[in-house]
Design a protein with these regions (language model features):
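Short, Lys/Arg-rich, polar N-terminal cytosolic tail immediately upstream
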Residues: 1-12
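Interfacial loop-to-helix transition and helix-capping segments at the boundaries
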Residues: 10-11, 48-60, 123-135, 150-163, ...
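Residues within membrane-spanning alpha-helices of integral membrane proteins
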Residues: 14, 18-21, 67, 99-106, ...
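Alpha-helical transmembrane segments and terminal signal-anchor/GPI-anchor hydrophobic tails
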Residues: 230, 236-264
Length: 264
């Protein structure tokens, strides 16, 4: 195995990724072991526990932003511009780490479902193992889950992969079509700015309100725009960097611990 080239790593991205992992793990753990019923409730304020238990879900969208940043930064570093992206190489590099793991996970979950293992068997009337497998491999599991009800947790977490990989498939084609025009950035801006509108317009479906495709793609588009901005702008002055960092921290804290007030 080749050693990791740490000179090419971005410490800020690594920090955000690590923070996202911790928050998502806490969120999923708290579904089974509510934080308000743990010893933490004796020491931590209720608002903090609410943020960790419920708004930790928002860390998934932080993952989306990071993904958008990375899938844009890598082709820019190799080619210099998105209009000349190598589509085959892009798909090959993206599929290598994901497809084997996805197939292994689907195979394992299918075996558990066939064995009727508790918490791994479809319980909703409209759900079937075949339909679930097809939606996972066809990258529309978020749509399937919205139409049929909550899937067992092992399957349900694949909703975010469905959104991300659909964007991943479309991204190089859009770059080839719009990369040589002035339409790419405005299109990404419109998509990124659609998040509040999308959230405000969905009330009838709890699952779709959380897992709708447009909302996830808007977060990924935000990461794409960030990568393009970093590419175009020179390194900021230290004071500007500190203020930008402070603004980002305040924004993250507001989303995680005052999310209800923000979206009302």
């Amino acid at each position: 195995m080749k050693p990791v080239d740490r000179s090419r790593r971005n410490p800020g991205i690594d920090l955000l990724r690590g923070l996202s992992i911790v928050l998502v793990v806490i969120h999923h753990t708290a579904i089974r072991l509510p934080l308000h019923k743990s010893l933490l409730a004796d020491w931590l304020p209720s608002r903090l526990l609410d943020g960790l238990q419920y708004d930790g879900f928002e860390a998934v969208f932080l993952f989306f932003v990071i993904s958008g940043f990375l899938i844009t930064s890598n082709p820019l570093a190799r080619r210099g511009r998105l209009a000349s992206i190598d589509v085959r190489a892009f798909y090959r590099r993206g599929a290598a780490p994901i497809v084997p793991c996805l197939l292994a996970l689907v195979a394992g979950l299918s075996a558990l479902a066939l064995a009727r293992a508790p918490h791994y068997t479809m319980e909703q009337p409209k759900q079937t193992l075949t339909g679930t497998v097809m939606s996972a491999l066809g990258l529309y599991l978020n749509v399937y889950q919205s139409n049929t009800g909550w899937l067992p947790a092992g399957w349900g977490v694949l909703w975010s992969l469905s959104i991300e990989e659909v964007f991943y498939l479309a991204f190089p084609l859009v770059c080839l079509l719009l990369g040589r025009t002035r339409l790419l950035v405005p299109a990404l801006v419109v998509l990124a700015m659609s998040i509040p509108v999308v959230r405000a317009s969905i009330h009838h479906d709890e699952i779709w309100a959380e897992e709708n495709t447009l909302q996830g793609m808007a977060a990924i588009a935000t990461g794409v725009l960030a990568a393009l901005l970093v590419r175009r702008w020179s390194a900021p002055r230290p004071s500007t960097a500190r203020w930008t960092l402070a603004l980002g921290v305040v924004g993250l804290l507001a989303v995680f611990f005052a999310g209800s007030e923000l979206w009302q």
